[in-house]
Regions:
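N-terminal glycine/serine-rich phosphate-binding loop of ATP-dependent small-molecule kinases
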Residues: 1-93, 121, 222-233
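Gly/Ser/Thr-rich active-site cleft segment
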Residues: 8-10, 120-240
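Glycine-rich phosphate/pyrophosphate-binding beta-alpha loops
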Residues: 10-12, 77-81, 181, 237-243, ...
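Short beta-strand-to-turn element immediately C-terminal to the catalytic PLP-Schiff-base lysine
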Residues: 18-20, 83-86, 139-141, 163-164, ...
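Short, hydrophobic/amphipathic alpha-helical packing segments
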Residues: 52-60, 136, 238-242
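Carbohydrate-associated surface elements
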Residues: 100
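Pocket-flanking alpha-helical
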Residues: 105-109, 243-245
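Catalytic phosphate/nucleotide-handling subdomain of diverse soluble enzymes
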Residues: 231, 236-261
């Protein structure tokens, strides 16, 4: 069995191929690339096209190494950043980086609608300028609300890449849960937060739990990549959640998780 994993970080991306044979497992890194944000006209963006290209380069290597026999593929990444697509799957805007200053410019007005304490009580998330909620609210503040109004779906970066592979729109649970828009008590999006900041609920994909077998890659992608196709699985897309899940925790231990901030 050949399992391919794509870990996208804020400074680089890596693809690992795991081969399971009887009771043995071997893991090899097959592709690595740099991921750098780009400043343009006072805003900060991710080069999502290059990320997609590099992901495909790694997938192509896995296809060659396995004789086109990939049994499962999954993605995790940093949280909060997203792409907005129309019904044809076209990106409506470049993908902003969480370090962009637009949230800082409008933080006071955003927090005047719901205080930091109220937001924490509703979502359970830390108050941070990079949260997805802050980014979406800042879009309204900067006169870009029409993009939200005309968007078909808002997809977190792993879900956006999965959409390009499968044509399916989802919102994975762990990465949704740290957006500052999720209600853990109701196990659903927090309608009070969405209503307060005029964020249309319809733009979110179907909430999907880790462990879900989403299905195979779409035919157009298979033709482009010259592959028979492969199954896509949903894991803990929030990279910190995946790190904790795979850690050998016991009752008497401490774990420090750190990445690129």
């Amino acid at each position: 069995m050949n399992i391919l994993a794509f870990d996208l970080g804020a400074s680089g991306g890596k693809l690992f191929l795991a081969t399971i044979d009887d009771d043995n497992i071997s893991i090899q890194e097959i592709h690595r690339f740099e991921n750098v944000s780009c400043s343009m006209n006072g805003a900060l963006f991710w080069d999502i096209i290059n990320i997609y290209k590099e992901m495909n380069t790694g997938i192509k290597k896995a296809i060659e190494l396995t004789g086109d026999q990939i049994d499962s593929f999954a993605i995790d990444s940093f949280s909060n950043d997203f792409g907005l697509i129309d019904k044809n799957g076209t990106l409506l805007t470049p993908v902003r980086c969480y370090r962009d200053k637009r949230t800082e410019r409008h933080a006071d007005h955003i927090y005047s609608k719901l205080s930091k304490e109220q937001l924490y009580n509703l979502s359970g998330n830390q108050n941070a300028l990079f949260n997805t909620l802050m980014q979406l609210a800042a879009m309204r503040e900067e006169g870009h609300g029409f993009i939200l109004d005309n968007a078909y779906k808002m997809l977190f970066i792993p879900d956006l890449l999965i959409y390009f592979l499968t044509g399916k729109t989802i919102s994975e649970y762990t990465i949704s849960s740290v957006s500052q828009m999720y209600d853990f008590k109701k196990d659903d999006w927090c309608q009070e937060i969405l209503d307060t900041y005029n964020i249309p609920r319809r733009i979110f994909g179907r909430l999907t739990k880790p462990g879900t077998l989403l299905g195979g890659t779409q035919e157009s992608y298979n033709r482009m990549m010259e592959t028979r196709g492969f199954p896509v699985s949903i894991v803990c897309e929030h990279d910190t959640a995946s790190a904790y899940l795979s850690s050998p925790l016991t009752t008497d231990c401490a774990l420090a998780s750190c990445g690129t901030w």
